[in-house]
Each structure stands twice: as structure tokens, then as C-alpha cells.
Amino acid sequence: MCLAARIRYLPIDSSKIRFMSKPESAPELSIVIPCFNEADGVEALATALEPVLGELEIDGHELVLIDDGSTDGTFAALESWRTRSDAVHPIRLARNFGKEAAMTCGLHFARGQAVIILDADLQDPPALIPEMIQKWRAGADMVLAHRKLRNEDGWFKRLTAAAFYRVMGVLAGNRVPSNVGDFRLMDRRVVDALLHLPEKTRFMKGLMNYVGFTVATIDYVRPGRHSGQSRWSVWKLWNLALEGITSFSTAPLRAWGYLGFVFALVALLYASWIVLRTLLYGVDVPGYASLATLVLFFSGLQMISIGILGEYLARIFIETKNRPLYVVERMEGFDADWVVGQSSRLVGNVVLPRGYDSSAPPQLDP
């Protein structure tokens, strides 16, 4: 039964729900594509993807396309694509929840034994899909697409990206591969491991690296966007970097403890020197200029440390609210009963389509 329905969330103890197995007709390959204001590029995406998928020797495929609250008619373009292909399954989120949430939504409803995450702007070449599948069948649980060249990015973005990956590796100990984006293939057990991670603040590159498994890599030169421009401003990239570091490392918190000890030691030595110099040589202590400078300096350090504490407290606040990662407004091409079964993978929430008999919920474990 195909479903085109509005979705609502009901709280339920998901730890007591038995996960529903995938339908017998589940495809071997799922491609998850987050979209935000990509109406002009949907047709080009279809033109690039369909020939590649048509030549694959696989037991079926599906395209899970997530419209992350677009305002330009992206979902209408996805619906038009679905009229030409039953493999297309569009999902529209109720608002813009961000790419990390959109990717999680796509993984949540992907049924394939292998799942590929692909950007809608064609900067992730569909031509690499056959090679990814080949490495997966050779035994790799995750196949990463490594950007050998990033000619489409300016020098500033390349420099800051390199700095972020280096800092992330040092502080977090979770060495996220540099020049590797979200474009990758994951085996079903990798996807299931990701879906069992309960945090609401999700830095997907870090989480994908965290779960481990056998990894293979392929190199490629990333082309420019087919249409439009990147929505990743410097401010958004900065916030993503903060999210990545604070999600995987407590080093910034520890650093202020060490820094405080060092400054206290320096202050003690300096105070001892002032006292000894005054007692032994009768040298007067200078005026208030140096004192005012020190006060301002340490006040600045305190403000920075409070800001770092605030970053961690904000993330704790988000986690304790336990809100769903996303809210689905509409979805097409999914079996209603399977959707309800899959909803148990969302910690603390279940998704029910309008009209579904909520008096007969999924079977509970005894």
C-alpha cells in the first residue's frame, strides 16, 4: 500500500517495541538525498542518476529524497519525478531542520542492504556509485569518497576545513578523515548502528566515524554545483565545527583547568617577586596601569571560559528536552505498516500516519 499522508509524533517507550523487519520487496540499494531549495536541480539530478542506476547489477534500488523545508517548490519537483519512477520516495519535513536531521530521516526510512548518501547539487558524482558497490561487495562496510581536489572551494574554505579536521583529531581523538564529506556508502549494519545512537545533537561525519567497521576509500575530483549556490555560510560552518568538537571532546573544558593552574602559578611567582623586591630593595610597586591591564586580560579569559561552558550546557539542555530530530509533514511511496514499525528506531517517539488505528499499536515485547 502506497502512502501519501501527514505524520504526527506520539510519545512511546521505544525500548519496549519490537523492531519490524524490512518488507520482502526491500531493494538492495537505497540512495538518501537531502534537498533544500533544489527545485532547479531536481531534473538534472534525475538525468544524471537514472542511467547509472539502470546499469547496476543489483536486486532493486530506491531513492529516498528528503525535502528539508524548502520554499521553492522542491517537493513538487520530487513528486513529478515520482510519477515517472516508483523507486522515488519523497519525504517532506515540516520545516527546515538542517542537513544532519534530514540525513538521519533518510537513513531512518531507507530499506536497502547498502545505503548511499548523496548531495542533490551533483557535486557528488553518481558515476562513482558502481565503484562504491564493488568495494562493498568486496567486504567493506563503509566506502568513503575522498576529495582529491577541492577546486570548487576558495582558499579560505580549504584552509579552515584543514584546520578543523586537525583540531578535531587532536582534541576529540576521533580522527574524522579530512576532505571526506557525507558522500559514502554504508552497509545495513552501519546504518542500524547509527540509528541506535540516541543523541539529538548529531554531527554525522563524527558519528559515522565513531561506529567504526571496515572502511574503504575511493578518490575523486569534486565538480562545481550544477545550479544555485552553497547555503553553507561562514557562520553555519563555524557552528557546525563547534557542534563537532563539543559533541566528541571534553578537551575544551579540561583546558581551562590547566590554564587556570598555569596562570595561578605565574601570579604566585610574580607576587612573590614583587614582595621580595620591595622588602629587600625598597622598590615601589608601579601604578595602576599594569593592574588594570591584567584585570581586563583575565576578565576576557573568564568570559571565554564561560562561553565554552555555555556551549556544553546548551547541548545538555537540548538532549534533556528529548524532542524528535525532525517532524515529517508528508511522505509518498512507503508502506504504512512498515513506517509504523520503523518508527520504533526513533528513541522516545513513534511516527503514525493520519488515519492509522492508534488503538492497535505495534506489538510490545512481554
PLM ranges: what are they?
Residues 89-95, 99-109, 123-207, 223-242:
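Acceptor/aglycone-binding surface of glycosyltransferases and processive sugar-polymer synthases
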Residues 36-40, 123, 127, 195, ...:
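Residues in soluble alpha-helical coiled-coils and helical-bundle/repeat scaffolds
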Residues 44-47, 51, 76, 162-165, ...:
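Generic recognition of well-ordered alpha-helical segments
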